[in-house]
């Protein structure tokens, strides 16, 4: 049976050819290798029809033009040569589209990403809708790749090299008006007239390219180009720490095309694409992409979720305000905030106002839409308006008695079906539910700060939580734009449990004489977004260390912080950035203020600040403890699978994405090598480095995590 075509051709009475893109059976249009023959057959028909005046590419999908290439197609390549051949095939196809003698216009609505934007770039003109769903980008770098279908060559010539480099090196998304301003599209119109606007453009001569801004013209010349690539190369190296080879290859390929011409550029692009597909970094980044896609499809349990029409939040502090924002503005659900005083409610409302007003200032949102979203949030100092809320999220202080009181109040003031979700970071959910009359409707829902930026949430059912409560909470998290993982109700859950020994070891090295900035720089070089000491300052030293006694009580001395160090720091009123002094000192400009290490920290903790360890040695000590604890979490079924463990670490604490997560990283090193490193460290520094039993067994059998069956807690 012949597969239905993803590209269909219809010729209008006015001799404009409409090519409709609609991948059968898929929500998103993605480009597959087998589509090349379909497009070539259409191009042949276009060339043979001498009456045609123009061509328009348009999508039949309601919210996307083309969302990029099918990643599975790339993963099926066994060699760099196969991947290079794939790129050359795509390049040839784009060249054939561009070589058509009549105007070819892309009519863009929704996501136009990767290969979709490269197809649009091969057209002679582009029109897009003013809908918020319409975004244009080349995100291949986020998968450890570069655009392989002429994108590195066409984009710099269209919008200028410096602007193009920013897009290609970061995967930055452009909204419609930004794209128009930069010259990436020729017009922005309402969705209702998109096709007609594109047809009108196709009836004219090919759109003439806009003259580039003076700055871009200067940078396109040999001297300007040399200076630009030197500066961008330096900045990129600092940002990536040399851990992402794709960025280096992007710079090389773009510069080759500008210096030696498009033919050399296309050749360099295809070769670089093929080589990057085979790098371990790209394979790890693609594994994270697939894992996160799977997690987003996971319903959490087999039970159907209950309806979600409105949500209540207890506590208007930093977390409560952030949760209210994502619930109203991402999930689109009415939110009622309860706080014991009006100031707390005002704080939460201001939190959402600040987020939305920032979008209005950046022209990402209309003022009317801001007001519409804000209208979903209301506040109260009692339980008025809570009677029919489907789910209540508790975000009050980390105090067990207080949280148990909140459960009792919700059961008294809300409907019988209402779910109680606690945002605790450390308290057992079973204890919070201990006195509940409906314990099956109590669950943990652990957000990370700042709520609007951190993609992960941990969903923590206790032993008596119902399957429907799990499914409903997972459903809410997805509506909020989060990636949820379901974890077992054990001390520290998953993310904080693997993070604590990592931070403890950093503090221990401080007491041994390593310098603050050396420890942080070592872990940034390893691939973390910030070092462990800076992370503690950002979270708040008082907040970040609160969980250590809980973990020590549950799991023993391997979670012990260096004696008296934490108490010495807290007794000196050092909380981190939030009060201007921690391990670092901060200026008065809030989160953007510059920081510098406070030299007084060393005598305070009885350290010299004259280290002897190299950066790799520092990183090794912190990371190995994290890996060991992650393996224990699999063994104890704290996480349902190694997939969830990798996602949790990457999305929750910034474990280097190019390593694929703790379990992918162990597999890449080999369990035997990890065991050998840990045993060496145990001999040097103590029994906390002793490899756990599960890891030793895997090493003996030569097993790897991603080739064994994932465990399931249910």
From Swiss-Prot:
Catalysis performed (reactions): a (3S)-3-hydroxyacyl-CoA = a (2E)-enoyl-CoA + H2O; a 4-saturated-(3S)-3-hydroxyacyl-CoA = a (3E)-enoyl-CoA + H2O; a (3S)-3-hydroxyacyl-CoA + NAD(+) = a 3-oxoacyl-CoA + NADH + H(+); (3S)-3-hydroxybutanoyl-CoA = (3R)-3-hydroxybutanoyl-CoA
Keyword tags: Cytoplasm, Fatty acid metabolism, Isomerase, Lipid degradation, Lipid metabolism, Lyase, Multifunctional enzyme, NAD, Oxidoreductase
PROSITE patterns xrefs: 3HCDH
GO cellular component, one term: cytoplasm
Record GO terms (molecular function): 3-hydroxybutyryl-CoA epimerase activity; enoyl-CoA hydratase activity; long-chain-3-hydroxyacyl-CoA dehydrogenase activity; NAD+ binding
Residues the UniProt record annotates as site (Important for catalytic activity): 118, 140
Recorded metabolic or biological pathway in which this protein acts: Lipid metabolism; fatty acid beta-oxidation
Record's subunit section: Heterotetramer of two alpha chains (FadJ) and two beta chains (FadI).
Protein purpose: Catalyzes the formation of a hydroxyacyl-CoA by addition of water on enoyl-CoA. Also exhibits 3-hydroxyacyl-CoA epimerase and 3-hydroxyacyl-CoA dehydrogenase activities.
Official protein name in the record: Fatty acid oxidation complex subunit alpha
